[in-house]
């Protein structure tokens, strides 16, 4: 599948990409091959693709693995892929990924085969990419994700403590997985061209055994980063008793002047547990 194929398909079928779904189709053969290459796929890996679109990456993935599962919301693209890729190792469902239990879906196709690793390989729809990332990192089965997202989001996910991009989302993701930005992708490699640059990142799931409510932790982190210029204890005092906060800082030997951007992810988890015990 090349640029001409996709552009001709768009013309022939009067296909108007959905802004609501964040549809920007990858045209570059070089980039799609590069994404698959960095995923280092073994035949015994189960691959999950989210938002396969016209199948630019799908047609390569299906040659690399014994089990490829794709989730596509757009009924037009779902119908296209049902006829375009007919190999027995390809399975596609027409659904919103945010409504799918990923682990249950994987188990449905993993009851007879010997699986080495479970990997997500995808060009994510940018409008909901943060929500998809949160689903991926909470999976008990997914080992790795090689995903394309907005460059800005990639930088937030991979941000280090004491840097500008470090925020609540950074901390939440890094509590669940190791992160690495692999390479950037220019907007001209898509149709229609997005207004932002993109990047491919690797998430290695830590399969965190720590028992906590991710929604409650997310709320806590947003409070911590509510005003990045304020001291952390001042942000926390909007919700928690200042006396308890001060004692917590003493117990953990923390500087009272620290801001949220100065705190490592694992320490945030300790603070969360301390204040919510």
Curated annotation (Swiss-Prot):
PANTHER family: DIMETHYLADENOSINE TRANSFERASE, DIMETHYLADENOSINE TRANSFERASE-RELATED. It is found in: Cytoplasm. It holds the Pfam family RrnaAD. SMART domains: rADc. Belongs to the class I-like SAM-binding methyltransferase superfamily. rRNA adenine N(6)-methyltransferase family. RsmA subfamily. Its main location: cytoplasm. Keywords: Cytoplasm, Methyltransferase, RNA-binding, rRNA processing, S-adenosyl-L-methionine, Transferase. S-adenosyl-L-methionine binds at residues 24, 26, 51, 72, 96, 123. One of its GO terms (cellular component) is cytosol. Coiled coil: none annotated. This is Ribosomal RNA small subunit methyltransferase A. GO terms for molecular function: 16S rRNA (adenine(1518)-N(6)/adenine(1519)-N(6))-dimethyltransferase activity; RNA binding. It is an enzyme of class 2 (transferase). Specifically dimethylates two adjacent adenosines (A1518 and A1519) in the loop of a conserved hairpin near the 3'-end of 16S rRNA in the 30S particle. May play a critical role in biogenesis of 30S subunits. Its EC number is 2.1.1.182. It comes from the Bacteria. It catalyses: adenosine(1518)/adenosine(1519) in 16S rRNA + 4 S-adenosyl-L-methionine = N(6)-dimethyladenosine(1518)/N(6)-dimethyladenosine(1519) in 16S rRNA + 4 S-adenosyl-L-homocysteine + 4 H(+).
């Amino acid at each position: 599948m090349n640029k001409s194929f996709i552009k001709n398909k768009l013309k022939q079928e009067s296909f108007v990409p959905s802004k609501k779904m964040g549809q920007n189709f990858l045209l570059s053969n070089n980039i799609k091959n590069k994404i698959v290459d960095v995923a280092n796929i073994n035949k015994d890996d189960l691959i999950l693709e989210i938002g396969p679109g016209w199948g630019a990456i799908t047609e390569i993935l299906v040659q690399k693995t014994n089990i490829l599962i794709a989730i596509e919301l757009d009924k037009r693209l779902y119908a296209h892929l049902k006829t375009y890729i007919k190999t027995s190792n390809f399975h596609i469902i027409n659904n919103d990924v945010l409504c799918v239990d990923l682990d249950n879906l994987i188990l449905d196709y993993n009851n007879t085969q010997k699986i080495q690793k479970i990997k997500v390989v995808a060009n994510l729809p940018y409008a909901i990419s943060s929500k998809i990332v949160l689903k991926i990192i909470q999976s008990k089965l997914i080992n790795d994700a090689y995903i394309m997202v907005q460059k800005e989001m990639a930088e937030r996910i991979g941000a280090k403590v004491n840097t500008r991009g470090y925020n609540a989302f950074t901390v939440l993701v890094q509590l669940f997985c190791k992160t690495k930005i692999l390479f950037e992708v220019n907007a001209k490699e898509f149709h229609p061209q997005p207004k932002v640059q993109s990047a491919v990142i690797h998430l290695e799931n830590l399969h965190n055994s720590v028992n906590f409510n991710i929604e409650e932790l997310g709320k806590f982190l947003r409070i911590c980063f509510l005003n990045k210029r304020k001291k952390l204890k001042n942000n926390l005092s909007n919700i928690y008793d200042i006396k308890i906060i001060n004692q917590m800082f003493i117990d953990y030997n923390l500087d009272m002047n620290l801001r949220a951007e100065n705190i490592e992810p694992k320490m945030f988890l300790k603070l969360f547990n301390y204040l919510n015990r």
